[in-house]
């Protein structure tokens, strides 16, 4: 329908010309009086004029001062937009109502995002912690494991009359993160088992190896070690695995603590954001209250100045009236004196005239 279409510039110009000639009334006679077709009903013309074309209506977004004023007035009057628009110059009730709806939707969306937003845990934050811990752990293992393995090898070699030969040559640990501590950042979560020292008794190796001269102080301690059983072998083979299990437990506890720390940090960040939002709203409210109080004070001062002007005007009028009355009285007295002097002069003139007439008559009567 035509009523639902956007207004064109020609239609707006037609409405302005109609209002200049006939005033903002009788909108159903626009087409008839202007001799131009306008497919709009009277209500649409009235709304268009009142909300968009009326002189003095501001266009564009609300300023920060107007926003604070609208927030304060909405808290005071509720959704009575006509009453609010009467206190916000240049803004219509329809415009303020639409702005308030958009403002409330934005606030609700921000609250939902701040309450329900869950940030993914960034595993890269733990890399430095795990790396430093792994380096420290590897240094400790590099000092403990070779000594234990060497002691176990010497004990087993002296008890069996030959040498123990491992399947692989024991190398000092690499100072970087071992593979069983490394975690995949791609999400595969493949964890390697911790390294352990494995000793084997190989007959071919023992037969092929050349006998070495026995060490006297080791031969003295050999019966005691034989009575205690294969303690050196158990020490060399079990100690790394036990330490590896305790390290894995400690690592799991460390990761759990880091996660709890991250969750606490996230909760603190959310709380800080919400507190900042509440503080911002409180600042807006205080700013609006300050603006309102300033405006009320200015209105009060203007009212007092107006009363003083009225009092001054009345005082000046009173003084002017008294002066006018005094002037009128002086003029009346002066006129009375003039009239009295004129009457005296007239009476004297009449008396003189009569005297002259008498004298002239006497002279004529004499021979």
From Swiss-Prot:
It is found in: Nucleus. Residues 260-344 form a coiled coil. GO terms for molecular function: DNA binding; DNA-binding transcription factor activity; identical protein binding; protein homodimerization activity; transcription cis-regulatory region binding. It comes from the Eukaryota. It comes from Arabidopsis thaliana. Its main location: nucleus. Induction: Circadian-regulation with an afternoon peak in long days and with a broad night peak in short days. Expression of AS1 in stem cells of the shoot apical meristem is prevented by SHOOT MERISTEMLESS (STM). Expression is activated by GTE6 during leaf morphogenesis. Expressed in roots, stems, leaves, flowers, siliques and in lateral organ promordia. Found in the inner domain between the adaxial and abaxial domains of leaves. Expressed in the phloem tissues of leaves, cotyledons, hypocotyls, and roots. GO terms for cellular component: condensed chromosome; nucleolus; nucleus. Residues 27-53, 81-104 bind DNA. This is Transcription factor AS1. Residues 1-53, 54-108 form the HTH myb-type domain. SMART domains: SANT (SM00717). Disulfide bonds: none annotated. SUPFAM superfamilies: Homeodomain-like. The keyword Nucleotide-binding does not apply. Pfam families: Myb_DNA-bind_6. Homodimer. Heterodimer with LBD6. Interacts with LBD6/AS2, HIRA, a probable histone chaperone, and RIK, a predicted RNA binding protein. Part of the AS1 repressor complex composed of AS1, LBD6/AS2 and HDA6. Interacts with CO. A C-terminal domain (252-356) is required for dimerization. Keywords: Coiled coil, DNA-binding, Flowering, Nucleus, Repeat, Repressor, Stress response, Transcription, Transcription regulation. One of its GO terms (biological process) is proximal/distal axis specification. Transcription factor required for normal cell differentiation. Positively regulates LATERAL ORGAN BOUNDARIES (LOB) within the shoot apex, and the class III HD-ZIP genes REV, PHB, and PHV. Interacts directly with ASYMMETRIC LEAVES 2 (LBD6/AS2) to repress the knox homeobox genes BP/KNAT1, KNAT2, and KNAT6 and the abaxial determinants ARF3/ETT, KAN2 and YAB5. May act in parallel with the RDR6-SGS3-AGO7 pathway, an endogenous RNA silencing pathway, to regulate the leaf morphogenesis. Binds directly to KNAT1, KNAT2, and KNATM chromatin, regulating leaf development. Disruption phenotype: Plants with double mutations in this protein and in RH10 or AS2 protein have abaxialized filamentous and trumpet-like leaves at high temperatures. In double mutants, shapes of epidermal cells of the filamentous leaves are simple and rectangular, similar to those of a petiole, but different from those of flat leaves of wild-type plants.
């Amino acid at each position: 329908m035509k009523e639902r279409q956007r207004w064109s510039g020609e239609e707006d110009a037609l409405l302005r010309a109609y209002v200049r000639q006939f005033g903002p009334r009788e909108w159903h006679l626009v087409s008839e009086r202007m001799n131009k077709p306008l497919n709009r009903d009277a209500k649409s013309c009235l709304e268009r004029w009142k909300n968009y074309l009326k002189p003095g209506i501001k266009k564009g977004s609300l300023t920060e001062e107007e926003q604070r004023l609208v927030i304060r007035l909405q808290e005071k009057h509720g959704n009575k937009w006509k009453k609010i628009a009467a206190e916000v110059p240049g803004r219509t009730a329809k415009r303020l109502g639409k702005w308030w709806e958009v403002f409330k939707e934005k606030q609700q969306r921000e609250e939902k995002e701040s309450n329900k937003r869950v940030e993914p845990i960034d595993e890269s934050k733990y890399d430095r912690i795990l790396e430093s811990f792994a380096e420290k752990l590897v240094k400790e293992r590099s000092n403990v494991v070779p000594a234990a393995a060497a002691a176990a090898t010497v004990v087993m070699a002296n008890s069996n009359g030959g040498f123990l030969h491992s399947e692989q040559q024991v190398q000092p640990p690499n100072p970087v993160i071992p593979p069983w501590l490394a975690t995949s950042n791609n999400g595969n979560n493949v964890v390697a088992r911790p390294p352990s020292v494995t000793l084997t008794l190989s007959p071919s190796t023992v037969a092929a190896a050349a006998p070495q001269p026995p060490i006297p102080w080791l031969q003295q301690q050999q019966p005691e070690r034989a009575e205690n059983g294969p303690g050196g072998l158990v020490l060399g083979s079990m100690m790394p695995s036990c330490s590896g299990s305790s390290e894995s437990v400690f690592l799991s506890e460390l990761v759990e603590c880091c996660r709890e720390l991250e969750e606490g940090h996230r909760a603190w960040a959310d709380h800080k954001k919400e507190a900042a939002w509440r503080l911002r709203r409180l600042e807006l409210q205080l700013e609006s209250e300050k603006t309102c109080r300033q405006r009320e004070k200015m209105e009060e001062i203007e009212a007092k100045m107006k009363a003083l002007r009225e009092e001054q005007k009345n005082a000046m009028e009173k003084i002017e009236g008294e002066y006018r009355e005094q002037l009128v009285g002086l003029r009346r007295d002066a006129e009375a004196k003039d009239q009295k002097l004129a009457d005296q002069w007239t009476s004297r003139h009449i008396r003189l005239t009569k005297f002259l007439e008498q004298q002239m008559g006497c002279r004529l009567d004499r021979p």
